[in-house]
Regions:
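Feature detects long, helix-prone N-terminal segments enriched in hydrophobes
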Residues: 2-86
Length: 86
């Protein structure tokens, strides 16, 4: 499943994940000439492995990570619905 989230939220989540040597994967759609780039509305597309839980205000997901370097890891996080593209 693919999910488009706000660029600032992606970077905030990535910063925490990188502290655990985990790098969140994005789709090729979010890369321009190999550089991570948000679309014109400020969204980055991430790869969701599994949706664990959903509340009125947020969803808990497992995001893919590590496919670029061949190390399959995942990152579990809550994503507020306010940062998800409609």
């Amino acid at each position: 499943m693919l999910l488009r989230i706000k660029e600032w939220f992606y970077y905030k989540t990535s910063e925490v994940a990188e502290g655990y040597n985990t790098f969140i994967d994005v789709t090729e759609y979010s890369r321009v000439d190999g550089v991570l780039t948000a679309d014109k509305n400020g969204y980055i597309e991430v790869i969701v492995r599994e949706v664990l839980n959903e509340t009125e205000k947020a969803i808990q997901v497992i995001l893919d990570s590590g496919s670029v370097v061949g190390n399959v890891k995942c990152w579990k996080t809550w994503i507020p619905k306010s940062v998800i593209a409609k």
